[in-house]
Amino acid sequence: METTLAKQLSGELNDILGRLDNSVRLVMDRCPEAEFNAYRTAIGRVMGVLVLDVLNPLYARNPEAKPDGYDDE
């Protein structure tokens, strides 16, 4: 994969992770605790898949696409 595409994908996927994280905060502020816990668990799974199955392999093959401060350990 070319570096430009890897960097673009990295940016898009990190934006998605940020939006998912923000959605958890919205639910935390507006929903009952049980509903929040279920939502947070589900979103955590989605975020885990994006990081472990998509971003980490992307960065392993294209280290130049890894954002500054990204810790994959």
Which role fits each region the language model picked out?
Residues 1-33:
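N-terminal acidic leader/helix
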Residues 26, 72-73:
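An interfacial alpha-helical scaffold signature
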